[in-house]
Amino acid sequence: MNLMLTLLTNTLLASLLVLIAFWLPQLNIYAEKTSPYECGFDPMGSARLPFSMKFFLVAITFLLFDLEIALLLPLPWASQTTNLNTMLIMALILISLLAISLAYEWTQKGLEWTE
């Protein structure tokens, strides 16, 4: 019951904060707020340059693989359990998923930097 009350309170509080932020008007909109800031100096060039999509895709791929590898970190502690077969099967499934997704990225040329 305590857990349900805590979850309900957190959900209601988060929803209330989102609604307040959504319905409050934007105040003090003027040109200085939308201009780029470079340590107090006038900008040397345009700060609205297009972003490299290849860099973005490689960065997202790196984050996904990094998160999947982070799932492998508890394996030394999991190897001390009595149910070792389940742990090994899950680890092999995760490593296979990593290998298959790496092969897919490679074949789709998602890891190539040059166009």
Curated annotation (Swiss-Prot):
A UniProt-annotated Pfam family: Oxidored_q4
GO BP terms: mitochondrial electron transport, NADH to ubiquinone
Main EC class the enzyme belongs to: translocase
Classification via InterPro entries: NADH_UbQ/plastoQ_OxRdtase_su3 (IPR000440), NDAH_ubi_oxred_su3_sf (IPR038430)
Cellular compartments annotated: Mitochondrion inner membrane
Gene Ontology terms, MF aspect: NADH dehydrogenase (ubiquinone) activity
Subunit structure: Core subunit of respiratory chain NADH dehydrogenase (Complex I) which is composed of 45 different subunits. Interacts with TMEM186. Interacts with TMEM242.
Protein name (database record): NADH-ubiquinone oxidoreductase chain 3
Organism: Equus asinus
